[in-house]
């Protein structure tokens, strides 16, 4: 899919009690269906947002305290993240409703005998959660699987409570094999089977192996299966599988790739992806999990390392509504969504909001459309007859 959206912003002036409708045009110029979601958000109290990254770490092991200290220097996270075995611990600063957005990591690419294939993309999961000041969250940010003659599985991205209860998990993408692409992370809890290969894990468990010696992805609770090495579950530290010189799985439970142009590794996730079979195609994508409200879940969307964004939510918006919040736009087609601005219950002043458009376009998956509205009084001009004015 290839998304095109107009307009890119709204700047409107309304009289008190006026209602105004404007159109948002969503066009798909790509060669596959475009899946999209629209969400209104209020700029009034937004801005309190915390973004957790892989701290520039790559490979099967997570970042160190020093690497994350350097990454977050000068940000709102400086001095507030403690790293233990690559897992980042953060204390919630204020009670409230938070939106947590997580992305699984991409699988590694393959290049064998002049044939190049790409790893599967990571899933995106988003939900709202009530958090308390002082509450500890454990955050594991998945890392991209290693690219070689075969690809390692991408790591899943996890957010859990201090007692290790999962809140939200985004599955990584499977590693590419010598003859085919890796399979993307999915929004369902079960990991996917590797292409003609091992079964994906279920109920938070690791995936299985098929023919060959690649490693399956791990789940939240149990490790991924492997003949050599093996990826570790979230509860066991989340290390990606890395036996010998084979392509390592990414941190977050990614399984290793195998051989020279062999099978791709399974991805980590809530449940792990399986490995590919004897056809040496791609590894399976990781499963995902979301216990939040107002969910936005999209499979196969992230082409990079994982990321976690936690945002203190703003109050609901009463003066703006959308005619549709989700849809599928076919190839070469256009969809129209109506934005209604309603100043009926507003006082004179300036109001700001935004529209977040999230899609499966890999090059432009998240678009913000700002809304600026000024409300003024409607002044009525009355003609006065000069003859009626007494001196």
Regions found by a protein language model. Give the residues of each.
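Secretome/extracellular-domain signature
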Residues: 119-224
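Extracellular beta-strand-rich recognition modules
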Residues: 98-104, 136-143, 169-171, 271, ...
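C-terminal subregion of chymotrypsin/trypsin-like serine protease catalytic domains
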Residues: 272-314
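GGW-centered surface loops in extracellular recognition modules
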Residues: 45-108, 167, 175
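Feature for long, exposed domains in two main contexts
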Residues: 1-47, 313-385, 389-390
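Acidic glycine-/aspartate-rich tracts in secreted/extracellular proteins
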Residues: 29-32, 43-44, 104-108, 133, ...
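Acidic, glycine-rich loop-and-strand cores that form catalytic or ligand-binding grooves
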Residues: 195-262, 266
